[in-house]
């Protein structure tokens, strides 16, 4: 049994991009789907899809630019043993605004840019650059 499914997702994406895979498959969950939606909106992945009824699987299609992965770093911030919450004024800026932080808020999972626009804070799930 996995203790941190989101960290597992991020590790699968990181490892798949390092070896040049075009897609990665993993067990699906609502939070993983929401994270994949943010990654797609921000242009870090090509697309994603969910297949299966009893045990749904999330397939993420990775994105490369001139043969290099678009995602240079993807790092878990808040974890089960140490939750990291930030209010709207304390939201992190990743690489001076060139990267994103994915935030779980009361209004859903979103990028730090969108959370600032809406004036909400929340749990900092991960950082992507």
Swiss-Prot record:
GO-annotated cellular components: ribonucleoprotein complex; ribosome
Keyword Cytoplasm tagged: no
Domain of life: Bacteria
GO MF term list: rRNA binding; structural constituent of ribosome
UniProt keyword Membrane, yes or no: no
Keywords: Ribonucleoprotein, Ribosomal protein, RNA-binding, rRNA-binding
SUPFAM superfamilies, per database record: Ribosomal protein S8
GO biological process terms, semicolon-separated: translation
One Pfam family linked to the record: Ribosomal_S8
InterPro entries associated with the record: Ribosomal_uS8, Ribosomal_uS8_CS, Ribosomal_uS8_sf
Classification via PANTHER family: 40S RIBOSOMAL PROTEIN S15A
Family: Belongs to the universal ribosomal protein uS8 family.
Function: One of the primary rRNA binding proteins, it binds directly to 16S rRNA central domain where it helps coordinate assembly of the platform of the 30S subunit.
Subunit description: Part of the 30S ribosomal subunit. Contacts proteins S5 and S12.
NCBIfam families listed in its UniProt record: PRK00136.1
Name the record gives this protein: Small ribosomal subunit protein uS8
């Amino acid at each position: 049994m996995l203790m941190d499914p989101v960290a597992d997702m991020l590790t699968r994406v990181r490892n798949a991009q390092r070896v040049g895979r075009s897609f990665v498959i993993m067990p699906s969950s609502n939070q993983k789907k929401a994270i994949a939606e943010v990654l797609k909106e921000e242009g870090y992945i090509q697309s994603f899809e969910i297949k299966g009824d009893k045990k749904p699987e999330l397939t993420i299609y990775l994105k490369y630019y001139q043969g290099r992965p678009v995602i240079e770093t993807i790092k878990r911030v808040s974890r089960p043993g140490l939750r990291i919450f930030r209010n709207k004024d304390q939201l992190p800026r990743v690489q001076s605004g060139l990267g994103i932080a994915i935030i779980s808020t009361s209004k859903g999972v979103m990028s730090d840019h969108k959370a600032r626009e809406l004036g909400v804070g929340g749990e900092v799930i991960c950082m992507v650059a």
